[in-house]
Amino acid sequence: MTQEVDRANQAIEFAEKGKIVSLVSSGDPGIYGMVGLIYEILADKKWNHHDGIYVECIPGVSSLNSCSALIGSPLMTDFAVVSMSDLLVPWEIIVKRVEAAAIGDYVTVIYNPASKKRIHQLKDTRDIFLKYRKPETPVAIVKGAFRESQKIVVTTLEKLLDYNDLLGMITTVIVGNSSTFNYNGLMINPRGYKSKYQLAPETSKTITEI
């Protein structure tokens, strides 16, 4: 974290000297990325965006986008995103947010599910979800999305901890809600079309029309 602060301050310092600076952030810089730190530092420096240095944030692809593309359509209705990292946010606050997501029946995307120093967080999170969701609720674990080392498992909330070897800082976990189902290894979160429309045409009707 201190390196991130140093990088941000250095980028701002170069920009204030008239340099064109690119600060690279993984995923989307506006989702758990570097742009928040840049703006916090600038706010502390009383930066004026009208006559101060020019800042442009170029959007990227966050883990919630890349991982959902690999496992079906898990984010078709309302969803929540929670990071398990307690380096900057107290664990007690993270627990409150997890519980709120579980109670609200949100599909939940979990960033930073574990590290070498953090081994209990995901177990505690799973226990919270099991209070409000069925054990067979679909869960996806995606490690290293779109990298050569990519690994994907679609399992259940009950069996989530059976895959501890996949958990780490480049892993994203997606917990389905009460409507999510597993179809041939894909997580599908229905948008609600089926309650309003007939989704697939009847075979006999199609043949007659032809």
Report each predicted region and the residues it spans:
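Short, acidic/turn-prone active-site loops that include or flank metal/cofactor-
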Residues: 1-7, 81-88, 193
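A contiguous loop/helix-start segment that scaffolds small-molecule binding in enzyme catalytic cores
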Residues: 20, 103-210
